[in-house]
Swiss-Prot record:
GO terms for cellular component: cytoplasm. This is Ribonuclease J 2. Homodimer, may be a subunit of the RNA degradosome. The keyword Nuclease applies. Binds up to 2 Zn(2+) ions per subunit. It is not clear if Zn(2+) or Mg(2+) is physiologically important. One of its GO terms (biological process) is rRNA processing. Zn(2+) binds at H76, H78, H144, E166. SMART domains: Lactamase_B (SM00849). The gene is rnj2. Belongs to the metallo-beta-lactamase superfamily. RNA-metabolizing metallo-beta-lactamase-like family. Bacterial RNase J subfamily. CDD domains: RNaseJ_MBL-fold.
Amino acid sequence: MSLIKKKNKNIRIIPLGGVGEIAKNMYIVEVDDEMFMLDAGLMFPEDEMLGVDIVIPDIQYVIENKEKLKGIFLTHGHEHAIGAVTYVLEQVDAPVYGSKLTIALIKENMKARNVNKKVRYYTVNNESVMRFKGVNVTFFNTTHSIPDSLGICIHTSYGAIVYTGEFKFDQSLHGHYAPDLKKMTEIGEAGVFALISDSTEAEKPGYNTPENVIESHMYDAFTKVKGRLIVSCYASNFIRIQQVLNLAQRLNRKVSFLGRSLESSFNIARKMGYFDISKDLLIPINEVENYPKNEVIIIATGMQGEPVEALSQMAQKKHKIMNIEPGDSVFLTITASANMEVIVGNTLNELVRAGAEIIPNSKKIHASSHGCMEELKMMINIMKPEYFIPVNGEFKMQISHAKLANEAGVQPEKIFLVEKGDVVNYDGEEMILNEKVNSGNVLIDGIGVGDVGNIVLRDRHLLAEDGIFIAVVTLDPKNRRIAAGPEIQSRGFVYVRESEALLNEAEEKVREIVELGLQEKRIEWSEIKQSMRDQISKLLFENTKRRPMIIPVISEI
């Protein structure tokens, strides 16, 4: 197994994302003077991140040490593993390593964002060995909900540093989804120095339901549907999409996709042979009405909450393309996260009101694309690591995974619970966590990268919750008088017609502040504006208990 004879001096493992959160995976491994980036993912914004499109890791540390970076190594083609690659490549030069499908999806992302940069791409597989000055890097096939997923092995003189990526064990899957247990066993027997492993389902007991069992239960449910069938699933779950295609074939139904998020990745994967599908199975969404309702399946796809949002719009007759009709059946394959439960519940009620029948779901028809407790222990037992670092999960999931590692025989002092920016150092004798590097989130709003910070988010929250209050006044500084105004405008604060007295009082307060400022020897515009903010804010809060954003506008003639 690609052992390194030359002794390495120092190893550093640094998570820049993917810890304390599910998504935004990015882990830096440094061996002596060589740096390797494992995954470069994004995260979709939380509800309170108003106006933010995506979130990526802060790579300032990588930029400061870019001469060391030997490459970006990717485990699979999901956005939380590859979504930040284009942004990273805009700031540093590095080759990109990934499976055939992963590289194809990266190239598509580069094209979509108009990043016209020459990049060296290396397509790797289960047999690839990439040789560097102080280490070798190899790969092993894993099972995830997207084909050609890989684990990554960095071979050092102390043993292998293994990053599992996101994985599960499912013996019912074959071909592009099959794990290479033989290769994993060989890696474990050769000696694993550190295991960096997926913690997403570390709190879920047992094993995942095998995918062939899920498909069988889906078939039983689908055969009972007499009318149009709408299946809601994530665009990233290629296994589930293939299962629906399989069942449509068996039930003699045509399939149409509703959701832009899938089109690009599906078409790429289909052209590359990752989907088993007959030529005449798919029909455009605008041709669905040409077929009897009992001869079609609509797959409503998207990222994050998009599939549920689409169903909600369809139920309320607000969707641009199609709406729910009495007699439709809806089947949800997505699992509602804690923050989505209320939204999903409301959507189900809307669907029923619109006349749809909800196909009852059971745990038998749900499987995560991440390993449950017994699968995680299986990976630990196969690899037999000296050190263990649980990643890709909320902190409580990392803790649960750490307990599993201890149960599997890893000594407690050799298990590291890390946060973003933590540096796990090994100097040849012991591994310690004794350092921190710059880390955090970079918020992307439209085409702006990193120009939305906490202050901007605070202002957006203020606008969303309490609105905006604008005071406009025109001055004649030469004659020291108010030439026009004050004029008060507000949006999202109070209903003007019902608050005329308050607005008139605010107007008089502005006039008073400005006239007082004009009496000073030297007129200080900044002081007048600040006084307007402070006193108007106090007045409005006393009367409404709300604090709108106050914008004083002073112009001169």
